[in-house]
UniProtKB/Swiss-Prot annotation:
Heme a3 binds at H381. GO terms for molecular function: cytochrome-c oxidase activity; heme binding; metal ion binding. This is Cytochrome c oxidase subunit 1. It comes from Alkalihalophilus pseudofirmus (strain ATCC BAA-2126 / JCM 17055 / OF4) (Bacillus pseudofirmus). Its EC number is 7.1.1.9. The gene is ctaD.
Length: 625
């Protein structure tokens, strides 16, 4: 028999929650903190490059910043921020009461978070990793890489476990938890792209985990996988890394495409043009994304045949991506467009991403890549993809879903000011870096001489970074201001949108839907507005709702993995104050002990009685939500 829900303090409630909505907000906060941290590093690096031969940062500090900036932005900022929206929105969009495995959802967050903390601890033990975010061997070997590389390896290994189990959870949720009538071809595009992105995580993070394990064995136990003098192969690391690294771009950009595919139809007052083509284009992009990893290695010496095959495969990705671009444009064509902040970010994404794609096709030409490789042209290209593609989409999604997540609107005036300051700053920063690359400025250098003609463009690029920073500060001000003065949202659907999450009350109750909705079409809420009375028809009567109990075990298990990783890092420390094996084995014992407790403990959750659900429904009807 299920127990009654226990009353908890606020902190205990958040530490033990398995509610997908609260976990989403924790992902949002953690991802934002890491985003700001990596952004400050970027600002410091641009200040160092503002003038020739600056001494704002030393070469060593610059190397550490450039490594941590890339690593944090991809693993600990972009990924969790997308996971925040995936966690909050997917169950609501498919008509589910939670994800398939709420306990695993909480575990995925806490493992990611403590993995990020483990990586960040490197600053207190001699400095961060300094081999670049790709950690190419031999730069990351024991001979050249300091203790920071051990934090990189173990921090990403722990964090990656959290990402992997969360992806499995999303896959099972989307396959098994859909409301009656919601076939796969009625899924919102955001759910489709998240589903395909989670599949990519499944296949991309496993080689990363294997590669990090081999590098760990090289560094901690003197294995020889990547040491040429002992029969190892440094190019092997490059292949292992990039067969993860290139799909990682699509792991991030596909859910971003999904956000754009939700925002543009909502504010164009039209259904998404070419839904079926968009679904299959997403599948093709994901498939081809695994076929092109070696285009990062054109200058390694794979030979003309391999280079040619990967060059052609890379250019082919432009075709399904082009389909998506035109479908977004056709969605806006003839629509009654509302240019609020979310729509400004979504529509500006399109030309920005196209420019990033065009430079991508240029880089795909293997002979020309010999000129571009390791120059600022490449830096400009991938920032147009990651900032112009992923970050603009995240901001669009934030302004779009913020009322549903927090119960109040963000200020539109501050929002539009944020958009223009950030967007102008972005192009100022990165457009001129194409030109710096064509002029021959190499990546990852901490200074340059005054007679090389690079002064003006570097100065402009740094000014742009100040604009971007000012934009992010405006966003923070907006969030704080709106929390106190923002317009409160009391209706379910402030945007007159099309999908199921806008059929839930605001704020969303812990059980999401009092009655599981019956889905009759793609864009189910819009269908009911046209063919019904504007409300979703229930697929079941009002009954007791079963809910999972919260648990502190995910938090404790993650602490155990944190200490296990730290204990292994201590093996490379000089004179550790405690035997590293005690820390490592103790951490693993804590994690496996929690797994054992979880296995033998009977926990059937609790029920929300039908009477309470009916009372909630009556209250909502009275309030007009």
């Amino acid at each position: 028999m299920a127990t009654q829900k226990q009353e908890k303090s606020v902190i205990w409630d958040w530490l033990t929650t398995v509610d997908h909505k609260k976990i989403a907000i924790m992902y949002l906060i953690a991802g934002t903190l890491f985003f700001v941290k990596a952004g400050v590093m970027a600002l410091f690096m641009r200040i160092q490059l503002m003038y020739p031969e600056m001494n704002f940062l030393s070469g060593q500090t610059f190397n550490e910043f450039i490594t941590m900036h890339g690593t944090i932005m991809l693993f600990l900022a972009a990924t969790p921020l997308l996971f925040a929206f995936m966690n909050y929105v997917i169950p609501l969009q498919i008509g589910a009461r939670d994800v398939a495995f709420p306990f695993v959802n909480a575990l995925g967050f806490w493992i990611f978070f403590f993995g990020g903390l483990l990586l960040s601890l490197s600053w207190f033990f001699g400095g961060g990793p300094d081999a670049g975010w790709t950690a190419y061997v031999p730069l990351s070997s024991r001979d050249y890489g300091g203790l920071g590389i051990d934090f990189y390896v173990l921090g990403l290994q722990v964090s990656g476990i959290g990402t992997l189990i969360s992806a499995i959870n999303f896959l099972v949720t989307i396959v098994n938890m859909r409301a009656p009538g919601m076939t796969m071809m009625r899924l919102p595009l955001f759910v489709w792209t998240s589903f395909i992105s989670s599949t990519l995580i499944l296949f991309a993070f496993t080689p990363l985990a294997a590669g990090l394990a081999l590098l760990m064995l090289d560094r901690l136990f003197e294995a020889q996988y990547f040491i040429p003098s002992m029969g190892g192969n440094v190019v092997l690391w490059q292949h292992i890394f990039w067969i993860f690294g290139h799909p990682e771009v699509y792991i991030l950009v596909l859910p971003a495409f999904g956000i754009i595919s939700e925002v543009i139809p909502a504010f164009s007052r039209k259904r998404l043009f070419g839904y079926t083509a968009m679904v299959f284009a997403t599948m093709i992009i994901a498939f081809l994304g695994f076929m092109v990893w070696a285009h990062h290695m054109f200058t390694v010496g794979m030979g003309p045949v391999a280079n040619s095959i990967f060059a052609v495969a890379t250019m082919t990705i432009a075709v399904p991506t082009g389909i998506k671009i035109f479908n977004w444009l056709f969605t806006m064509w003839g629509g009654k467009i509302t240019f609020n902040t979310a729509m400004l970010f979504a529509s500006s994404f399109v030309p920005t991403f196209v420019l990033g794609g065009v430079t991508g096709v240029m880089l795909a030409m293997a002979p020309v890549d010999y000129l571009y490789h390791d120059t600022y042209f490449v830096v400009a290209h991938f920032h147009y993809i990651i900032v112009g593609g992923i970050v603009l989409s995240l901001f669009a999604g934030l302004f779009y879903w913020y009322p549903k997540m927090f119960g109040h609107m963000l200020n539109e005036t501050l929002g539009k000011l944020f958009f223009w300051v950030f967007y102008i700053g972005f192009h100022l920063t990165f457009f001129v870096q194409h030109l710096l690359g064509l002029m021959g400025m190499p990546r990852r250098v901490y200074t340059y001489l005054g007679d090389q003609g690079l002064d003006a463009f570097n100065f402009i690029s740094t000014i742009g970074t100040f604009f971007m920073s000012a934009g992010v500060i405006l966003l923070v001000i907006n969030v704080i201001y709106s929390a106190f003065k923002g317009e409160r949202v009391t209706v379910a659907d402030p945007w007159d949108a099309r999908t199921l999450e806008w059929a839930t009350p605001t704020p969303v109750p812990e059980y999401n839907f009092a009655q599981t909705p019956q889905v009759r079409s793609l864009d189910p809420l819009f269908y009911e507005k046209i063919h019904g009375d504007g409300t979703m028809k229930p697929a079941e009567p009002v009954t007791d709702i079963h809910m999972p109990n919260g648990s502190i075990l995910p938090f404790i298990m993650s602490i155990g993995l944190f200490f296990a990783g730290f204990g292994l890092i201590m093996l490379n420390m000089d004179n550790p104050i405690i035997n590293p094996w005690i820390v490592a084995i103790g951490g693993l014992a804590l994690t496996f002990g929690c797994m054992f407790v979880r296995s033998i403990k009977e926990d059937h959750g609790y029920h929300i009685p039908a009477e309470q659900v009916k009372a909630d429904l009556a209250e909502l009807k009275k309030g007009g939500n």
